[in-house]
Design a protein with these regions (language model features):
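Active-site catalytic microenvironments in core metabolic enzymes, especially phosphate/sugar-handling
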Residues: 1-156
Length: 156
C-alpha cells in the first residue's frame, strides 16, 4: 500500500530498517538501511524470525545485504524501482520463477517471504489505533487469519 504508517512502514520497522523512505513515486514500498551488512543467508533467517515465516524463497545475487527495499504483498513488478533506488536486496512476496531468474544478473538479492507474513506486521498498529480511537470497544486481532502456505523441505 502507499499509506504513510501502513503496511510497508510496518514491514520496514519489523525488519529494523532505518531511514525508510518510499520506494516508488506513488508511495509504494519502502527503502531503508540495515544497521550493518549481513550475508544473504543470515538476512533470510532474520526475515523468517522477524516475520514469523514458515520459510522464505530466495535468490542470491552474490551481494551482502545492506540497502533493502520492501513491498508488502505482491510487489515483484517493482524490481526496476528497486534497482533505481540503489538497493542490493528486495523483500516482497508472490515472486515468479522468471523474476527470480532475472534478479541475479541485475545484481538484486530477492527474498519472497510470503504474502501474509509481509502484510501482517501492520495489524498490531491497526489494533492499537482502534483501541485508542474507540476505548469503549474491546479490539481483538483474529487468530484465524494466518499463513496458510506450508513448506516441505526434503531431509527434514
Amino acid at each position: 500500500d502507499v499509506a504513510v504508517g501502513g503496511v510497508n512502514d510496518a514491514l520496514a520497522r519489523a525488519l529494523e530498517l532505518t531511514d525508510a523512505e518510499p520506494l516508488c513515486e506513488d508511495g509504494l514500498g519502502r527503502v531503508g538501511q540495515l544497521s550493518e551488512p549481513l550475508a544473504l543467508a543470515e538476512f533470510a533467517r532474520f526475515v523468517c524470525r522477524r516475520l514469523g515465516c514458515n520459510g522464505v524463497r530466495w535468490a542470491d545475487a552474490g551481494r551482502p545485504v545492506s540497502r533493502v527495499a520492501v513491498g508488502g504483498g505482491a510487489c515483484g513488478d517493482e524490481i526496476d524501482a528497486v534497482i533505481a533506488a540503489g538497493c542490493d536486496t528486495f523483500v516482497t512476496s508472490d515472486l515468479t520463477y522468471h523474476q527470480f531468474l532475472d534478479a541475479a544478473p541485475k545484481g538484486i538479492n530477492l527474498i519472497d517471504a510470503g504474502h501474509f507474513p509481509t502484510e501482517d506486521p501492520v495489524c498490531a498498529k491497526i489494533v492499537a489505533y482502534l483501541e485508542k480511537e474507540f476505548p469503549q470497544l474491546i479490539i481483538i486481532k483474529t487468530t484465524s487469519h494466518k499463513e496458510v502456505i506450508q513448506y516441505f523441505v526434503e531431509g527434514e
